[in-house]
């Protein structure tokens, strides 16, 4: 994004980017861009939000396609779509939470059930909401804490790749042209 705060986040995290969101499906079956930003957790219209980023809000916009195992794709697709839509509905309108204590002092591994993408009465940081959605859908192992992920952890070769469920992968990052 185009601000000093976001430049600082990139520098501190050694990350190519400072903010992440996730393309998700809402309960109407529409593709949305689910983000946690200063205005809170919001499911934005996908095309309109990407246009905003490309025109006014970011130096660059990139995406990574999530791939599930081909052999289980059909039976899994309905369950994934339903879990995704429920999560989007539960978190839309929740507050944003960027806490240095939360991010710096959260252990990567979690022995509690708090990492299961439970959306009740929570606030989220941008990369945390992505990890929590992946966990809810069974795409990211629950042995890690969603709050421990930084935006750069979702980049090519990032920590997130090591925590993906068996057979799930993220394709290489693709930059979008404005």
Q: Where on the chain are the PLM-derived regions?
A:
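Cysteine-nucleophile amide-bond enzymes
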Residues: 1-178
């Amino acid at each position: 994004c185009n601000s000093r705060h976001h430049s600082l986040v990139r520098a501190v995290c050694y990350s190519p980017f400072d903010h992440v969101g996730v393309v998700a499906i809402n309960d109407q079956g529409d593709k949305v861009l689910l983000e946690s930003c200063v205005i809170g957790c919001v499911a934005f219209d996908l095309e309109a939000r990407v246009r905003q980023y490309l025109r006014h809000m970011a130096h660059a916009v990139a995406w990574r396609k999530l791939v599930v195992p081909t052999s289980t794709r059909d039976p899994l697709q309905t369950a994934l779509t339903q879990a995704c839509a429920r999560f989007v509905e539960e978190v839309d309108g929740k507050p944003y939470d960027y806490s240095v204590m939360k991010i710096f002092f959260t252990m990567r591994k979690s022995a509690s059930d708090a990492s299961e993408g439970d959306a009740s009465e929570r606030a989220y940081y941008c990369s945390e909401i992505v990890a929590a959605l992946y966990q809810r859908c069974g795409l990211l192992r629950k042995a890690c804490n969603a709050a421990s992920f930084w935006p750069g952890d979702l980049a090519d070769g990032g920590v997130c790749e090591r925590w993906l469920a068996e057979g799930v992968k993220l394709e290489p990052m693709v930059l979008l042209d404005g």
